[in-house]
Amino acid sequence: MLLIEKEIHIPSTKEGVILLKYFEGAIKAQLSIGEVPVRFAITKSDADGYHCELGILTESDTLPVGQQISIFDFEKRRIENTDKFNAVMIVPTGIGAELGGHAGDATPVARLLAGVCDKLITHPNVVNASDINEMPENGLYVEGSVISRLLMGTIGLQDVRSNRVLLVIDEHEDKQVSELAINAASAARITLGLDCAGVVKINPPVYLRAEYSSSGSAVGRVEGLERLLDVIYRRRSEFDAVAVASKVDISEGLYTKYFLSGGEIINPWGGVEAMLTHSISSLFDVPSAHAPMAENMDEANALFGIVDPRMSPEAVSSCFLHCVLKGLYKSPRIITDRMLFSHPNILTAADISCLVIPDGCVGLPTLAAVEQDIPVIAVRENRNRMKNDLGKLPFVPGKLFIVENYLEAVGVLTALKSGISVSAVRRPLAETQVTSEHLCEQLKSYDEGKIPVKVSKAAAAEK
C-alpha cells in the first residue's frame, strides 16, 4: 500500500459554482480505482484553472478499517456560537513559509494569537520544534486533516484531561537511535506525566521518502503503509493518540545542505510526514503526529555551528520526538457522532470565529471557511510557495481580511471579537452609503401581482 503525490490541473469554472463540489468531481474523474485523496492543496490558480497537489492513498480496498470518509464531505453550519471566540491558525506544511516553515518557528505567533482567543486550534507544523514544544496553554494541538474536517463541519473536538499515547517506531538498524526514542517516551512519562501505552517497534519499517513537487513544496512517498495501519488497527482499544517515529529518506547530502542554507532550503521532512498523519487520523479518527528518526548516531550528533535561528531547535535536538509527545498528551478527542455536536463541551464548526492563514494558501480549510462564512485573515508577510489570489474566491463581503503581518492580524482578531467594524478604526473612512427606494412603484407592483408575496397556509385557508 502506497501514499503518493499527484499533480493535476483542473480547468477554471464559472462564477456561482460551489468550489468544494466542483473540485471533488474534477478530482474523482482523474483518479484510478482504489485511489483515495488524503490531502489537497491548490498551489497555483490563474485564468486557465487550478494547479492542484494531492496526497493519494492507493489500494484503499485492502484497508483493515471499515467505511472510508471523503475529504470533501461537508456539512453547512446553521449558526455561529458567539459565547466564545475561538480561532484556527494554519501554516500548511512544506510550503516554505517564512514563519512556520522550519522548526516550530511560528510558535510565538501562535502564542500571540492565543492571547486574544478563548481557544486557538492549531497543528503540529506550527509548534513542533524537535525536542521543544511551547504551544500556548489554551491551544488545541490537532492534526491537519482533523482541522479540515472540523471546518468542513463533519467532526467535533472534545477537550481531554490526558491521552494514552502509543508510540510506534522503526526497529532501527542502529540500536542507539531506537534507544533515543524509548528514552524520549520515558522522559515524557516522568515530566509530563504522560500515560505511554507502550512502544511498538516495526520490522521491516514503513518507508518514507521526502521529495519536492513542481511548485517547490515538500511532498513525498510512503511504502509499506499497511504494516503501520495493521499495528494501529489491532491495538486500537489500547490508546487514544498515536505518535510515529521513523526514518525519512532524503537526497544524499541534503541534510547538511539544509542546515547550512541559512533557512533558504524548504524543510524536506514535513510534507511526507503530513501525508502519513493525514492517513492515520482520517482512517482511525485519532490524534496523530510524526517525528523523524536520525539515519544514524553520526547524524543525530552532527554539529553545524551557529545555524539560522529558525532551525536552531533541530540543531540542539537529537531525538526530535518530545514535541510530538507533548502535543498528543492533551490533543482533543475527535467526535464523529453528530448527535453529540450540540453538547456544550464539544467544539464544532459553529464555534469557530476566524481562520488565520498565510496569504495565498488555498486548501480545504480555506474553501470550507468560504462556505461556512467564517472570516479569514490572510497574512502577507508569511511569504510561501503558494500562488493564489484569495480575493478571487467567493467570500461574502467583509469576510476576507488581507493584513501585512501577524501583529495586524491580532488587531483584526480583536476587532472581530469586540464586534467593531475594521473600517471604523482605519482612515480614510469611506462615506456613509445612502440609497433611495421608490416605494410607490414597489407598492404598485405588489398590487398588480408582479412581485409574489408569501402567504402562510393558515391565511390561504381563510381565503
Residue ranges and their predicted role:
Residues 126-134, 207-211, 283-290, 395-401, ...:
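Noncatalytic linker/hinge segments flanking ATPase motor cores
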Residues 136-145, 305-323, 393-405:
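Acidic, Ser/Thr-rich peripheral helices and adjacent loops at domain boundaries
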Residues 2-258, 262, 266-270, 448-458:
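Metallocofactor- and cofactor-centric catalytic cores in central/energy metabolism, strongly enriched
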Residues 205-377:
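Long alpha-helical, hydrophobic tracts
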Residues 133-135, 256, 301-304, 389-391:
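Short secondary-structure transition/capping segments
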